[in-house]
Amino acid sequence: MYHPRELYPSLGAGYRLGPAQPGADSSFPPALAEGYRYPELDTPKLDCFLSGMEAAPRTLAAHPPLPLLPPAMGTEPAPSAPEALHSLPGVSLSLENRELWKEFSSVGTEMIITKAGRRMFPACRVSVTGLDPEARYLFLLDVIPVDGARYRWQGRCWEPSGKAEPRLPDRVYIHPDSPATGAHWMRQPVSFHRVKLTNSTLDPHGHLILHSMHKYQPRIHLVRAAQLCSQHWGGMASFRFPETTFISVTAYQNPRITQLKIAANPFAKGFRENGRNCKRERDARVKRKLRGPEPAATEACGSGDTPGGPCDSTLGGDIRESDPEQAPAPGEATAAPAPLCGGPSAEAYLLHPAAFHGAPSHLPTRSPSFPEAPDSGRSAPYSAAFLELPHGSGGSGYPAAPPAVPFAPHFLQGGPFPLPYTAPGGYLDVGSKPMY
């Protein structure tokens, strides 16, 4: 075991262990109690560490003035004026949307806080004057508690309901234009509309963390500094506006505040009368969801007086009923009645899109009467719908090219619907997997 004198020779020979104090802890044996005493750290023992520094003379005069540092962000200093603490002479800040804030303050402003973060409305929008046009400044904003009480909505007003929750971590919002010259800040109003409030203590995005049902007030800081992380502050000023006091909530408690937010917030126009998010539209959407999906309406297009429309056949193809006994000979063409609904069907196209682009020329030849397939030696597949293609040039039973105008049959899964083209032709299995 090393003696402290061996571990710290720089402390000098005067370093010694303190004597045992009366009434010491009896948990250590008397032989070891002396070895666990803290050394007496008087002034001579620290001279070896402070040899390069001279002791400042003690005088009764006041210390010379030092440059003021900004107060800790998130803490509320004791301002000398009701609204601002100045170390930037001649600088003034005014609230641009003061009338809007006053309208909300007369009712009792509430700000929604969420886990993901919610923007403030109204937002702090200020104008600054009196800055040095060439100097660079930072604009900061934090939110401080107004008092040490927790509030509760009593139906008509807010009333204190107990002691406030412990203080949350202090955070500061830095305006994205910082640092910028005084001319930049004075050119137009400065808006803090991107500030977000959250109630998540583990928020990783830097949003301002607040307690629900507590009263807060935004505070704006103007700091003269050349860099964002500069330690050389040239002065700062803090501004507060009594109209901006609000109570943080997770849901609006005062119905009048809800109406004001909808009427004044341009992003809440959907909640206004006849908007997409008004109560009437929300109730209608809920009813539609409870009813379930509505079945697709299919119109009966068999009436002859129906002029044209979704079921109007404009492709020139005819559809006839499939009757194996009355099937025509391969060289015989029989006129079929006009189709009841010969227009293209979106459902048929989704099931069998290949039928709308002509059959491929490599498909085997089948006759409409479901005989044994001579080319494959196996029986015809279940529920086949035959696609008969016109004869091509050169005497072949297959067309030389796909038809110029594709047909548009209505395929229904599980049933054959042959086409009135001359046989033989290709086929498609309607009951099989769609050919994409």
Curated annotation (Swiss-Prot):
This is T-box transcription factor TBX6. Gene3D superfamilies: Transcription factor, T-box. It holds the Pfam family T-box. Keywords: Developmental protein, DNA-binding, Nucleus, Transcription, Transcription regulation. Residues 274-339, 360-379 are annotated as: Disordered. The lineage of its organism: Eukaryota, Metazoa, Chordata, Craniata, Vertebrata. Residues 100-273 bind DNA. One of its GO terms (biological process) is cell fate specification. Residues 274-284 have a biased composition (Basic and acidic residues). It is found in: Nucleus. It comes from the Eukaryota. GO terms for cellular component: chromatin; nucleus. Its main location: nucleus.
